[in-house]
Amino acid sequence: MATSPQKSPLVPKSPTPKSPPSRKKDDSFLGKLGGTLARRKKAKEVSEFQEEGMNAINLPLSPISFELDPEDTLLEENEVRTMVDPNSRNDPKLQELMKVLIDWINDVLVGERIIVKDLAEDLYDGQVLQKLFEKLESEKLNVAEVTQSEIAQKQKLQTVLEKINETLKLPPRSIKWNVDSVHAKNLVAILHLLVALSQYFRAPIRLPDHVSIQVVVVQKREGILQSRQIQEEITGNTEALSGRHERDAFDTLFDHAPDKLNVVKKTLITFVNKHLNKLNLEVTELETQFADGVYLVLLMGLLEGYFVPLHSFFLTPDSFEQKVLNVSFAFELMQDGGLEKPKPRPEDIVNCDLKSTLRVLYNLFTKYRNVE
């Protein structure tokens, strides 16, 4: 039964007119009705809240709402298959990432007369991955050049991926690709693989930050296809991963002042040629002609006034490793000359990363610009 609110002793009492008996009866009825309605409302809210909670759990496993490829519907009971949400493929950052990776692969394989147009369609059989890894690592793999059957393709892919994983030295849980996923043209697995390769070999490219893909996980339960969606991160903070998270003047030049960047390049070319001309050497392309480390080593000898014994470095390096050793040796000579350890990695220079090369040469210019 509804009760009257307790009166505060601080509030002065005011005369209250007496209500007729019939009004008291009405108040009692309305009070009961109000209590019933309140309880019903509360029960309804609880029911709605419970339904909302159940929907949050069950909706990810609701029947799929878009058309699947016929092959993706041929699942055994409880079998699980993942695929990219078709709507996610149109994401601008994902499109940018795929374009950057395709352009990078085509640049690396320009001498092989290989042109990649679609990552999933062109990389699934292992042929392009083999050529890409051989170029990056300067190592020939012992695999068949051409494979037609699915079994032969998977065997080749197995060998290529094992070699890649051995080189990358990633912990098992960080390896998000395998023979089956790559051969099945799983875009998520292929992107993870290419991003890992580009970061390990310090590819001279800029991957877009924080690229994610909406992945649909399809499962067959009691004869019905059900799905749930998860957000798969492909790239995080790519500058932090590559060790270039501290922005400097060269980041600003590249991003906002390409005209001034050309002036800096011409200044550095003039500076290095002033000294390399003494050996009848000349530089026209900064990013490529310093990539094997030879000119860097010779330049340090000229700037410091000593002869670098030819047995100390590879005069004609023919592998990625030898080029890295040359650049590392040049970095040691720079530190011996009083310079701080260069921020770029030797691999950055070998991979023709222009920004990294400019950083190294500008440090030399700052210290030795008055040397004749």
From Swiss-Prot:
Disulphide bond pairs: none
UniProt feature coiled coil, ranges: none
Gene Ontology MF terms: actin binding; protein kinase inhibitor activity
InterPro entries listed in its UniProt record: CH_dom, CH_dom_sf, Parvin
Knockout consequences: Embryonic lethality, due to severe cardiovascular defects causing whole body edema and severe bleeding due to vessel rupture. Embryos show defects in the septation of the heart outflow tract. Their cardiomyocytes are round and fail to align in a parallel manner. Blood vessels are frequently enlarged and show numerous microaneurisms. Besides, blood vessels show abnormal constrictions and increased vascular sprouting. Vascular mural cells and pericytes display a rounded shape and impaired adhesion to the underlying vascular endothelium.
Major localization class: other
Species of the source: Mus musculus (Mouse)
Bilayer topology annotation: Peripheral membrane protein
Region feature Required for interaction with TESK1 and ILK, mapped onto this chain: 223-372
Keywords for the protein's UniProt record, in alphabetical order: Acetylation, Actin-binding, Angiogenesis, Cell adhesion, Cell junction, Cell membrane, Cell shape, Chemotaxis, Cilium biogenesis/degradation, Cytoplasm, Cytoskeleton, Membrane, Phosphoprotein, Repeat
GO annotation terms (biological process): actin cytoskeleton organization; actin-mediated cell contraction; cell adhesion; cilium assembly; establishment or maintenance of cell polarity; heterotypic cell-cell adhesion; outflow tract septum morphogenesis; regulation of cell shape
General function of this protein: Plays a role in sarcomere organization and in smooth muscle cell contraction. Required for normal development of the embryonic cardiovascular system, and for normal septation of the heart outflow tract. Plays a role in sprouting angiogenesis and is required for normal adhesion of vascular smooth muscle cells to endothelial cells during blood vessel development. Plays a role in the reorganization of the actin cytoskeleton, formation of lamellipodia and ciliogenesis. Plays a role in the establishment of cell polarity, cell adhesion, cell spreading, and directed cell migration.
This protein's record includes keyword Cytoplasm: yes
Subcellular location, record wording: Cell junction, Focal adhesion; Cell membrane; Cytoplasm, Cytoskeleton; Cytoplasm, Myofibril, Sarcomere, Z line
A GO CC term assigned to this protein in UniProt: lamellipodium
UniProt protein name: Alpha-parvin
SMART domains associated with the record: CH (SM00033)
Residues bearing the modification N-acetylalanine: 2
Source organism superkingdom: Eukaryota
Calponin-homology (CH) domain location: 95-202, 262-369
Record note on quaternary structure: Component of the heterotrimeric IPP (ILK-PINCH-PARVIN) complex composed of ILK, LIMS1/PINCH and PARVA; the complex binds to F-actin via the C-terminal tail of LIMS1 and the N-terminal region of PARVA, promoting F-actin filament bundling. Interacts with TGFB1I1. Interacts with ARHGAP31. Interacts with the actin cytoskeleton. Interacts (via C-terminus) with TESK1 (via C-terminus); the interaction inhibits TESK1 kinase activity. Interacts with PXN/PAXILLIN (via LD motif 4).
Chain intervals for the UniProt region annotation (Disordered): 1-31
Pfam families: CH
Family: Belongs to the parvin family.
